[in-house]
Amino acid sequence: MELNFTIQVWQKGNLFVAKCPELDFISQGKTSDEAKKNLFEVIQIQFEEMDELGTLEEYLAECGFEKRNDSFVPVSEMIGFERLCISLP
């Protein structure tokens, strides 16, 4: 079974924060690579527990994925993002 998802990495002070917006998981590390590694570990542990409970497919559906053959694919796809600036009152 396969699942493709997005990872965002942010630097906050001396730490790096890795987020998966589609799955609503987050982790941190001292480096970008460590934060990503920790995030993968969190996702794997959570998915194993959900699979044992029989709730994994339901969770993925709530996160906006649907099962197609041997993969879960997003129902919607991010096509871009922008950094904008507005004037505050």
Locate the predicted segments by residue.
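Short aromatic-glycine-(Arg/Gly/Cys) micro-motifs in beta-strand/loop hairpins
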Residues: 3-22
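Short acidic, gly/pro-rich beta-turn/loop elements at beta-sheet edges
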Residues: 17-19, 28, 37
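Short, charged, surface-exposed hinge/linker loops at domain edges
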Residues: 1-4, 37-89
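A short, exposed loop/beta-hairpin motif centered on an aromatic-Gly-Thr core
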Residues: 23-33
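Residue-level preference for alpha-helix termini and adjacent loops
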Residues: 22-25, 78-80
